[in-house]
Amino acid sequence: MDYRESTGESQSKYKGIRRRKWGKWVSEIRVPGTRDRLWLGSFSTAEGAAVAHDVAFFCLHQPDSLESLNFPHLLNPSLVSRTSPRSIQQAASNAGMAIDAGIVHSTSVNSGCGDTTTYYENGADQVEPLNISVYDYLGGHDHV
């Protein structure tokens, strides 16, 4: 019997992620119009993997509605992304890792695709700025 069977977690409640048999959560997404996939990373929590998927999905697809996302309240639908798949991959991975690092609750959040600052409340009831802007990770590179 594996971990998922013993805990009753054979399937995730979040879209775009899966659990490895050793317990890590992973996420990847297809690049529209290609057969390519972007590996978004391996995460300690399902929420971290799901946020990474949301950021990448939003940046790649620019959906009219955020209802298809795992955490629709975390992204601002008015932002537009004009970034490369590699930069989207980096922003998504960093957003997921930030969630894994102990970020618990969002108080005012924008997409990881735009040039915005995001505020999260951590487990110590403090509000700290967390910038998950893709442009910060690029250092001025890979803009489309």
UniProtKB/Swiss-Prot annotation:
PANTHER family: ETHYLENE-RESPONSIVE TRANSCRIPTION FACTOR ERF019 (PTHR31985:SF200), ETHYLENE-RESPONSIVE TRANSCRIPTION FACTOR ERF042-RELATED (PTHR31985). Belongs to the AP2/ERF transcription factor family. ERF subfamily. It is found in: Nucleus. GO terms for molecular function: DNA-binding transcription factor activity; transcription cis-regulatory region binding. Probably acts as a transcriptional activator. Binds to the GCC-box pathogenesis-related promoter element. May be involved in the regulation of gene expression by stress factors and by components of stress signal transduction pathways. One of its GO terms (biological process) is response to fungus. The lineage of its organism: Eukaryota, Viridiplantae, Streptophyta, Embryophyta, Tracheophyta. Disulfide bonds: none annotated. SMART domains: AP2. Keywords: Activator, DNA-binding, Ethylene signaling pathway, Nucleus, Transcription, Transcription regulation. The keyword Ribosomal protein does not apply. Residues 13-72 bind DNA. One of its GO terms (cellular component) is cytoplasm. This is Ethylene-responsive transcription factor ERF019. Its main location: nucleus.
